[in-house]
Amino acid sequence: MEHMKKIIILLISLIALSCSKNDDDFIGSIETDINFMPVEIYNNSNISENPGLKLKLITREEFPCYNYSLITTQSIEDNELIIRLEKISVPTICLTAIGPATSYIDLPEKINKITFINGNTIDQYSITINQEKISINIIDNNFTHLLFNQTFRYPHNSFAYVSGTNTDNTEIYEQFLEVLKENPNLTEFDFEREGRIPYPTTSDGHWVNHPSKYFQYTDYKEFENLKSILKNFSRENIEENSGVSISIYGWDNISYHSWLSN
C-alpha cells in the first residue's frame, strides 16, 4: 500500500512538472506573425518638434477592437536592440473597428542589429541608420516580416506639397506648384533611389489625386510665409465645395491647409 502511495505521488509530481513546462512555453510569446518598419513620428499635433525615430510593430492578425496593443520588453546590448514579444493586451475601452495590435519602440541611431524573440524563436536583422535613410536587411526571419528595406527620413528644412482636385479644375494643382517653383527661397528636390518616403506621396479621396512635390528652404521664416501665401491663393482660386484641397506638410510637424484658409 505504501509502495502504491509513492507511485501515485511520483505520477502527480511528473504531471505537475509537465504542466508547468507547457505553461512556460507560452509565457512571453504571441501566436501571430508581425509586420514591422521604421517610422518617424511626433508626440503632439501641429506643434513644431523634431520627429522621433521609432520601430512600428503591427500584428498580421486582426482583432475585434482597433486599439489592441502589442506588449513588448526591450533592451540594448552592444548596439543590438533586443525586442521580446510578451502578449497582446486587450483595451479597457474598445474602439469598435477591426484592426491589428500595434506597438512603437524607440529606435536609437547607434543600433546596428535588431533581434526579435518570440518564445523560443529568434529573428534577426542588420540595420544601418544615417541622416538620409534607414536600411534594414534580413539575417534570419521566421515570424517577423520587414515591410520596407529602405526608409527615407524627413530631410531637415523640408516640406511636401500635397494636392487633390476635381476632374474639371486640375489646373489649380499646377498653378500653386508654379507659385512654389517661382519662389527663389525654395528649392524643389526628389527622394533619390528606392525607399519608402515619409511624406504622403499623393493626396487621398479626390477625383484626381496628384503626385506630391517636395521642397527645401534655408530660412524658417520662408516656410512660415507659406501660410499666408496659401491663404491668399485659396481665397482667389479655390471655390467652396469644388473638390480641391492643398496641404503643406513640414518636416517639423507644422502643416497648412487650404480648407482652413478660404
Please tell me what each predicted stretch does.
Residues L180-L186, D190-N262:
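Preference for solvent-exposed, low-hydrophobicity sequence contexts
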Residues Q124-L180:
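Surface-exposed beta-loop interaction hotspot
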Residues N22-E86, N141-G164:
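Acidic/polar, low-complexity intrinsically disordered N-terminal segments immediately downstream
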Residues K110-T121:
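A short tyrosine-centered beta-strand micro-motif
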Residues L85-E109, N209, F215-L230:
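An anionic, turn-rich surface loop/hairpin at beta-sheet edges
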Residues M1-M4, I12-P38, N262:
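Bacterial Sec-dependent N-terminal signal peptides
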Residues E80-T92, R193-D204:
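Solvent-exposed serine/threonine-rich low-complexity stretches and specific carbohydrate-binding patches
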